[in-house]
């Protein structure tokens, strides 16, 4: 029999901090894995919504309500109080998201985003905090995307540890076709019901799923999918893949393996490391069959198994060939050796696709802002370079960030000389400018080695 927890709002009414309530819920979820939470909706308070408002970025795009954070703040307390009143009466109805399209990195395709109205952003953020307190205790160690205290770099560290120290011989790559657009709403609600029995919370989540999309002035219903762009989307996506993929991998597929197998997932992007060839070769078909049950498909052209690891590197050297490579989280991973040549190492460099996309995006940005004052351009460009180094400046990828730095210099020189009626630069004058207003030099600041035993 599944036990139910009826959280009482009394503690919160008596002044118990919101964070304490969420921590207590997380502790219960961690201790009692089959517990269903019956009373969570009382947490949708002014305190929580005000905190969500403070966390909201001021430069976020507006939804169909066209209300900005600055405008909402003009009468903040009254606005939030009235919002809470509608929530408690369960009279709150989300508005359709505003559909926009952004370029997909490294591709001519566009990625659809759904921009919620301002109050929808607040309510989504509050629901995400509540759901996260429960499901963060359930998610497996191999899941890294959109989770507190975890990052892409943590996923890459786990990958290095697995490939270099756990005998990986094969990598299985898979791509879920249009994951966010194909989430089945009925399955989503059934998955949430495993842990949540508060009908008001479930009803509000369902309303967001069904809120619709406005595009070119027309509203259409959303019968499936989770719009990318809302703060509740990442936690819902993680819940869906937790049940559809992660638990199946841990409890079914891996238990049937002859060798070791490990899943490393960041949102809907994932890699499987395996030691046994037979296990590796059966993975794509079994994955496709599993995902089909939940309305998802694998992209056949992006799903493959390759030999990769210590043995793969040795086999390739024996036949004077290069070992296979694979891309994950913006990096191309390849087989190599330590500097002294004595030990196998997996190394990584910025993937060609991501590199080209980053250079193209920077080119468009420089073209657009080239008429700004030179000092303004140099300051903003410095921030962009630092952001690039913070992500791509990882162990073994100095040449990747250095190459990007040199491409940036060439683009900057080109576009500073395309400003009408402005001073043109010779290369010597441009070098003088860089000495006066220096750009941050390429650096590796993220080390992807584990010191000591890794736990997941």
Label every PLM stretch briefly:
Residues 1-456:
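Non-catalytic terminal/accessory segments
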């Amino acid at each position: 029999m599944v036990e139910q927890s009826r959280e009482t709002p009394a503690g919160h009414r008596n002044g118990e901090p919101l964070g304490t309530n969420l921590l207590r819920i997380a502790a219960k979820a961690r201790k009692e894995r089959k517990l269903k939470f019956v009373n969570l909706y009382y947490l949708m308070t002014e305190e929580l919504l005000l905190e969500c408002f403070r966390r909201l970025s001021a430069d976020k795009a507006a939804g169909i309500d066209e209300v900005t954070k600055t405008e909402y703040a003009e009468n903040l307390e009254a606005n939030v109080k009235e919002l809470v009143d509608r929530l408690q009466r369960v009279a709150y109805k989300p508005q359709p998201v505003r559909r926009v399209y952004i370029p997909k990195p490294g591709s001519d395709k566009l990625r659809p985003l759904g921009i919620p109205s301002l109050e929808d952003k607040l309510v989504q953020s509050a629901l995400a905090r509540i759901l996260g307190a429960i499901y963060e205790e359930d998610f497996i160690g191999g899941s890294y995307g959109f989770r507190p205290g975890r990052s892409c770099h943590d996923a890459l560290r786990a990958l290095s540890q697995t490939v270099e120290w756990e005998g990986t011989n094969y990598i299985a790559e898979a791509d879920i076709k249009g994951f966010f657009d194909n989430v089945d709403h009925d399955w989503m609600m059934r998955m949430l019901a495993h842990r949540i029995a508060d009908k008001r919370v479930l009803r509000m989540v369902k309303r967001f799923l069904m809120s619709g999309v406005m595009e070119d002035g027309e509203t259409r219903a959303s019968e499936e999918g989770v719009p990318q762009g809302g703060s509740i989307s990442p936690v819902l996506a993680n819940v869906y893949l937790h049940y559809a993929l992660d638990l199946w991998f841990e409890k079914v597929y891996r238990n049937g393996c002859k060798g070791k197998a490990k899943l490393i997932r960041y949102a809907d992007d994932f890699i499987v490391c395996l030691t046994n060839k037979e296990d590796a070769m059966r993975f794509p078909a079994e994955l496709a069959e599993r995902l089909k049950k939940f309305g998802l498909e694998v992209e056949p052209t992006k799903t493959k198994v390759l030999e990769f690891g210590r043995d793969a590197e040795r086999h390739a050297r024996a036949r004077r060939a290069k070992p296979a490579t694979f891309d994950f989280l913006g990096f191309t991973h390849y087989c190599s050796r330590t500097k002294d040549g004595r030990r196998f190492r997996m190394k990584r460099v910025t993937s060609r696709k991501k590199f080209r996309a980053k250079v193209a995006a920077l080119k468009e940005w420089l073209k657009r802002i080239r008429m700004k004052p030179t000092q303004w351009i140099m300051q903003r460009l410095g921030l962009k370079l630092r952001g690039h180094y913070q992500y791509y400046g990882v162990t073994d990828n100095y040449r990747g960030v250095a190459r990007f730095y040199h491409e940036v210099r060439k683009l900057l020189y080109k576009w500073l000389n395309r400003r009408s009626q402005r001073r043109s630069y010779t290369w010597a004058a441009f070098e003088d400018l860089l000495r006066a207003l220096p750009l941050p030099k390429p650096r590796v600041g993220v080390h992807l080695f584990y010191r000591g035993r890794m736990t997941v």
